[in-house]
Amino acid sequence: MKKTKQPVIVLVGPTAVGKTKLSIHIAKAYNGEIISGDSMQIYKGMDIGTAKITSEEMDGVPHHLIDIKEPDESFSTAEFQQLVRMKIKEIAARGKTPMIVGGTGLYIQSVLYDYTFTDEKSDPAFREEMALFEQQHGPLQLHEKLKAVDPDAAKAIHPNNVRRVIRALEVIHTTGQKMSEMQNGHQEVPLYDTAFIGLKMDRELLYERIHQRIDMMIDEGLIEEVSALYQSGLKDCQSVQAIGYKELYTYFQGDCSLDEAIQQLKQNSRRYAKRQFTWFRNKMDVTWFDMTPPCHFSDKKEEIFAYIAGKLGLKAKL
């Protein structure tokens, strides 16, 4: 008798495409609980820059893996995989539907597929050498090093995320294995019965929404939020490598004007959105739904509910 896989709903897409609102509608319709698939929303005190969902927006839907780490703590893909798989079991045991929402492709891929990690080997001297190289030549040159030896990992990791770039280089250095190939047998069949929903939008409109979101973040206190982290002495932590924090750090360090930092933030956010879409399109079996106006939210929601019903056999509570 064939073993039935656990149904899981996954909602992905680039930043500012509208995942948050739709995720709540889906969770309510399918008695779901949401697991954050965002690599930076795990950090406490980093609310505005990560576009963290508010308690009002949650509207009573339980959310997991938000605010579980201090900003000075590190967090790995392997740890994320372990925590999410545990949460999926816990949610299912309560008779609820597990749902993953986010945009960090490698993290989500590690959960859904038979993705195993090499032993956590490290070489402090090599890391120090790469950190010195980055200080002398800048993050783009360091990223080029990674691109030369592991192009797939380079596509998934932003040049500003120096810690992850160095870690990917360190994996190759210590194990001889590419981080992007740490997938057992390149297993392509998901471990779960997955309804994989992707949201997309006309690029120019998406970029406009990204700019509006950043302007809103600044109005809501992003500069003050980043300043508090900077003043607390957090300088080389994984958390402040995130888009929205790294750029403003250059301003606080006196390397550029505030306007230049904001423009760089907008540019990096656009590039990241493009990379997010490319990653999910190329790496996973996503069914895409176009959210470009004049589509009506209610009509698009019904399309997605029909897809979930066909894929998982789940009936929405309307």
Curated annotation (Swiss-Prot):
What the entry lists under Gene3D superfamilies is as follows: 1.10.20.140, P-loop containing nucleotide triphosphate hydrolases
InterPro entries tied to this protein: Dimethylallyltransferase, IPT, P-loop_NTPase
Task: List, in alphabetical order, the GO biological process terms annotated in this UniProt record.
Answer: tRNA modification
Look up the record and name the cofactor or cofactors this protein needs: Mg(2+)
Q: Where is this site: Interaction with substrate tRNA?
A: T104, R127
List UniProt keywords, sorted A-Z: ATP-binding, Magnesium, Nucleotide-binding, Transferase, tRNA processing
Give a yes or no for keyword Nucleotide-binding in this entry. Answer: yes
Q: What is its EC number?
A: 2.5.1.75
Where on this chain does substrate bind? T15, A16, V17, G18, K19, T20
**A molecular-function term among this protein's GO annotations:** ATP binding
| Statement: the UniProt record of this protein carries the keyword ATP-binding | yes
For the protein in the UniProt heading, the enzyme class is transferase
Q: Which reaction does it catalyse?
A: adenosine(37) in tRNA + dimethylallyl diphosphate = N(6)-dimethylallyladenosine(37) in tRNA + diphosphate
Q: Where is this region: Interaction with substrate tRNA?
A: 38-41
Cite the binding residues for ATP: G13, P14, T15, A16, V17, G18, K19, T20
| HAMAP family found in the cross-reference section | IPP_trans (MF_00185)
Q: What is the role of this chain? A: Catalyzes the transfer of a dimethylallyl group onto the adenine at position 37 in tRNAs that read codons beginning with uridine, leading to the formation of N6-(dimethylallyl)adenosine (i(6)A).
How does it associate, per the subunit comment? Monomer.
What family is this protein classified in? Belongs to the IPP transferase family.
Could you tell me which NCBIfam families the record lists for this protein?
miaA
Protein's UniProt name: tRNA dimethylallyltransferase
